[in-house]
Amino acid sequence: MPPTLALLLFLALSAVAAVGGAGDVRRVLHEPLFPIEWTPPPSTASPSPPSPDFSSDPSTPATPVDNGGPALLPPPPPNTVAADVSSSRSGPDPRARGGGGGGTPKAAIVVASAAAAAVLALLAFAAAFLLTGRLARHPAAAAAQAHKPPGHAHAGAGSVAGAHADVAGCSTAVSPYRKVRPERARRGMCRDVDTVPSPELRPLPPLRRGASALTQGSSDEDAAYYTPGQRSAGSGGGGGGEGGGTWSEASASSPRTTTASRRSLPSLTSDFFPTTPAAAPVPAPAAAAPPPAPPAPRSRRTPPRTRFSAGSGAEMNKQMASPPSNPPPAPPPPPPPPSRFNNTTPKPPPPPPPPEPPTGPVSARRLLRPLPAEGPSIVIPRAPAMAVTKDNDATAATMSVRTRGEAAGDEPRPKLKPLHWDKVRTSSDRDMVWDRLKLDEDMIEVLFMNNSTAVAPRMDNPKKVGMPQFKQEERVLDPKKAQNIAILLRALNVTLEEVTDALLDGNAECLGAELLETLVKMAPTKEEELKLRDFTGDLSKLGSAERFLKAVLDIPFAFKRVDVMLYRANFENEVNYLRKSFQTLEAACDDLKGSRLFLKLLEAVLRTGNRMNVGTNRGEAKAFKLDTLLKLADVKGADGKTTLLHFVVQEIVRSEDAKSEKAPENHITNIAKVEQLRRQGLKVVSGLSTELGNVKRAATMDFDVLHGYVSKLEAGLGKIKSVLQLEKQCSQGVNFFATMREFLKEAEQEIEQVRHDEKAALGRVKEITEYFHGNAVKEEAHPLRIFMVVRDFLSMLDHVCREVSQQDRTFVGSARSFRISAANALPILNMQGQKGGRESSSDGDSPSM
């Protein structure tokens, strides 16, 4: 309590002095400004406490002094302010003082009022501070304070200032940021002077746990590392260190809202009330007294008194040597500080590894403090984790089994085929379905082994090292081509001896056209042929395709013989096809010229066209091109359904009925008989398509293609002649040349006959074209076009005949009148018979209407 009263008294006096100083400055503002230069005093090892810059507002907390940074003087203010202050303090002009004598009572009243207000505000602030500190003190900290001896209560409070003064003196020339903080705080740029200069100097905060675990862990840590027994074994500054530790407990457990106000007052106490020589701790060398690591902080900022500690090296060694006490189920106490902060302490006996708690963020100003480099460093091994999940157990077991297998000299696991999936990370804090799954890895390796890796062990087998790889070293043909040849040979089911005998004798019937075509496809290139001929090794080293081609190439001009034999095998079929095609063309010309029904249809179209073109330039025509037949279906009647082709078909049907009808005069024909005759006439018209079947087949031919086939046969004869010229160069296979010589004579005769048939067919086609088109035959680009036109017309005629057969004598009356007027050879009936016939016909037509 005495330090608190001293603090309040000092603050009151400072406020009065500040108000008085402000009044003096205000009275000398009219004085001229003199450029007074200010020289900063040299920095000393023992820092002097700077005068705090208090505000007259009691609600604003005082600016704390950083004990962790260097204790340097603040930078000088501008020259104008320094001149005013220095002039006012050194003694203003007597005229100014004399002139202000009249305002002394007013100034005294103002000073007294301000002092009274400041005292009241400070008393209220002190009461609130004490009340808040008592309520916010953690129960565990209060219990630790209660267990202290009675003598330590005052010793700790009295040695706080000494400890902080020592720490401030040790870190005077460390931080360059100490120079600008008072100026920034004076200008109001920042309220907290403890701002960390760079975020890279501050490590990441640990993972947060529950509030209860943190609170319990904090109390355990305080009880383990800040005990009176440990302080008694230290140096003379142990009391100060204990006081600092007690203050850290209160600051760490206090709420966040009161951190700024509580952070500033203890630093002021240590700065403005220096300790006596008896209470001041003995300064220890930097190499013997490194600061211990603070407990895990509750926030990102560390309170001022928890940044440094005044403990000695012996105290730290004692803490590291003594194992931590076994706590209740709460988390274990924190480990000793890291080795980078203790690299100057002597090496103690190795302590048992304590459990590692979550590491809090290290203060940035501690990182800025230079650490000596000499002395061995202590490396504290970390204890293994206490809790192991199920999946970690399974993974560890699997890895251990694989490690033992590899250590025992087993073969490496083969590479399997990949499975592309979306990998999900399993959680270690909950039970999942994947923890219960088991796989048969041996079966997976058997089923899904990669072929490239599966072949490698077999190739490296020492039993097969001595055997040469014939398929890779002795292969001549392309692998794909050799495989195709082997497949063809198995499909044809023929032996090598049969092929060689047929080639030597020239017997094409023995092999057949299919096998000869396959041999032509097997023909190697010139490079492959040279390799096969020059091969002198063991034939068993070659594949089946290479052995077959090697045996065939041993025959002179083997593949030329194959071409000639294939020509001979196909010659007869090709000649027969050409002869049949030419005969079809001649038959089509004869059928088209001699068809009576086709000529009658042309007559009906000509008469109808002349009747429709009366009075025009197209009228009175004597002939028309057959292409007009394709336009009959485009001319439609008034009803929109009946076309000109329908009408022509009906007229041809009735004309056929009239020829088959042989009734006497004045005889009324039976309606059923007329219908029957009508159907017969329709069959006759529809039979035109069958009658001109050769025309349809001729329309599918191309005369240029037929001429190309004939030319190909003649070229084949030239190949036979060239092979026969090689007879003198061959010592074997004489029967082949004799057989080919006989075939050549027969083939020449056949080709001459085919040439004659071709000319005859072409002449007949030109003749039939002139028969229908006259001199327009010269305009035809395609010689067989006339057959294609007739074929298309016949398909249209069949379609119309099917439609007419479905109708029920729709145009009987109009067709009969047209028939009577057109056929003059029919007998003229008397009026009565004609009327009776008309009545009967009308009666027969009425039901159908």
Swiss-Prot record:
Q: Topology relative to the membrane, per the entry?
A: Single-pass membrane protein
Superkingdom, natural source: Eukaryota
Coiled coil stretches, renumbered: none
State any single GO MF term.
actin filament binding
Q: Where are the transmembrane segments?
A: 109-129
Report the protein name in the record. Answer: Formin-like protein 4
Q: Where is the composition biased (Low complexity)?
A: 53-64, 247-279
Instruction: Using the record's annotation, list all stretches that form the FH2 domain.
Output: 406-823
Positions of the region Disordered? 36-104, 185-364
Give the UniProt keywords, A-Z: Membrane, Signal, Transmembrane, Transmembrane helix
> Where is the protein found, in the record's own terms?
Membrane
- Residue span of the signal peptide, if any? 1-22
Residue spans of biased composition, Pro residues class: 38-52, 280-297, 324-339, 346-360
**Basic and acidic residues: compositionally biased ranges:** 185-194
User: Which Gene Ontology cellular-component terms appear in the entry?
Assistant: cytoskeleton; membrane
Give the species: Oryza sativa subsp. japonica
